A protein has these predicted regions:
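Conserved phosphate-coordination/catalytic loops
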Residues: 23-26, 77-82, 163-164
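Short, basic, glycine/proline-bearing loop/turn elements
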Residues: 14-20, 65-77
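General structural signal for secondary-structure boundaries
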Residues: 4, 83-84, 153, 164
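Short acidic (Asp/Glu) patches
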Residues: 77-86, 117-121
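Class I S-adenosyl-L-methionine
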Residues: 34-45, 49, 53-73, 92-164
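SAM-dependent nucleic-acid methyltransferase catalytic core
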Residues: 1-42
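A short glycine-rich, Lys/Arg-flanked "PGG" loop and its adjoining helix->strand segment in the class I
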Residues: 81-97
């Protein structure tokens, strides 16, 4: 796969990956407003949940217990609040379908097609983190469960993560 760097019309850097993937490092609201209606078949997003993660004091150590978190104050308060309604309006306008991770944190329409990511945390790890994550989808399908161990330092098959 060939990659190329280029400047966008927003004077931000983007990465082009063949055949048709472009990664943009810009404010998403600036970009969304440049898109036409239904430009994308699918939008997969993981917006800020509004839980203030930068202020949480603990994370998980290698043995599954809690460890003092590093100082992340330099990343700012990006996760202090959920996106404004304008974001949701633009996201729905520019994409035919959506998968929204953390959908349980947001005021979204009713959907049957949720995805449950079972992080396989099990009691043996003795941690206080969630057992899984929810993704809201626009698809009219039954709920689906995806099982993959991911709990801080405990992660399934990280030996060959590039090959996944």
């Amino acid at each position: 796969m060939e990659t190329k760097k280029k400047e966008t019309k927003h004077n931000e850097q983007s990465v082009l990956c063949e055949p048709r993937i472009e990664l943009l490092n810009i404010n998403c609201m600036v970009y969304l407003k440049t898109c036409i209606d239904n430009q994308f078949d699918l939008a997969i997003v993981d917006p800020p949940y509004g839980i203030g993660i930068h202020k949480m004091n603990f994370t998980q150590n290698r043995k599954g217990g809690l460890a003092k978190r590093g100082d992340y104050s330099s990343v700012g308060d990006w996760d202090k609040k959920i996106p404004e309604q304008e974001y949701w309006n633009e996201l729905m306008r520019i994409s035919k379908n959506q998968i929204i991770w953390g959908g349980n944190y947001f005021p979204l329409p009713q959907s049957r097609g949720w995805i449950f990511w079972d992080k396989r945390t099990e009691d043996k790890y003795n941690v206080d983190f969630a057992d899984g994550e929810l993704a809201w989808t626009s698809f009219d399908r039954p709920i689906r469960c995806f099982r993959w161990l991911w709990n801080g330092m405990l992660q399934q098959n990280m030996k060959n993560k590039q090959a996944r």
